[in-house]
């Protein structure tokens, strides 16, 4: 009923504006007073994110019952405890190689005694010599220190990594006090 009353009031105002034009500036002022109201109020759509359906949440009437029950994180069978600390992680700090018998041959040799051609395997090593101090076992040969001492007696000079290296500006005298 209220919407029909406001619609008829708007119609009367428009009729009043059309039948009684006074001067041009007041007519424009009164012409801008026309109000249109709509009574439809729509709520914003709500997006509900749900994991895989387990049957109990599908059978619920409002879709929210049963969402929190029975859900827990489960590690996949191939996720390993890569640091030997009893914690499984999906983010690994090195590539895990399953232990294999000593007499089993492989295409890749991971022992340092077989690699006599180079002192360095190309991997990045932290400065200071003590490294990350985490234990991977005897089979771990992936290029970062484990805090077990100096290792080989002859080490090559450490080169700076990308964050420590100073950029080389060619053609610009940035470091000189010229002008």
From Swiss-Prot:
**Where is the sequence biased in composition, kind Basic and acidic residues?**
131-142, 170-179
> Keywords assigned by UniProt?
Nucleus
Q: Name one Pfam family in it.
A: PPI_Ypi1
Where is composition skewed (Polar residues) in this entry? 1-43
Q: According to its UniProt record, where is this protein mainly located? A: nucleus
Bias category Low complexity: which stretches? Answer: 52-64
The function of this protein is:
Regulator of type 1 phosphatases which maintains protein phosphatase activity under strict control.
Give the family per the record: Belongs to the YPI1 family.
Q: Please state what the protein is called.
A: Type 1 phosphatases regulator ypi1
Organism expressing this protein natively: Sclerotinia sclerotiorum (strain ATCC 18683 / 1980 / Ss-1)
From the broadest rank down, the organism's phylogenetic lineage runs:
Eukaryota, Fungi, Dikarya, Ascomycota, Pezizomycotina
């Amino acid at each position: 009923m209220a919407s029909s009353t406001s619609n008829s009031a708007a119609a009367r105002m428009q009729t009043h504006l059309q039948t009684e034009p006074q001067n041009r500036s007041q007519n424009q002022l009164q012409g801008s007073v026309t109000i249109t109201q709509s009574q439809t109020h729509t709520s914003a759509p709500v997006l509900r994110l749900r994991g895989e359906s387990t049957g109990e949440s599908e059978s619920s009437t409002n879709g929210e019952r049963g969402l929190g029950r029975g859900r827990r994180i489960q590690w996949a069978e191939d996720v390993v405890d890569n640091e030997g600390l009893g914690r499984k992680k999906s983010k690994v700090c090195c590539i895990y190689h399953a232990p294999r018998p000593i007499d089993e041959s492989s295409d890749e040799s991971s022992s340092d005694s077989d690699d006599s051609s180079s002192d360095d395997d190309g991997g990045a090593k932290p400065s200071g010599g003590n490294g990350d101090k985490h234990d991977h076992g005897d089979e771990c040969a992936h290029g970062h220190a484990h805090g077990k001492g100096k290792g080989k007696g002859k080490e090559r000079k450490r080169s700076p990594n990308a964050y420590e290296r100073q950029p080389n500006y060619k053609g610009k005298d940035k470091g000189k006090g010229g002008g």
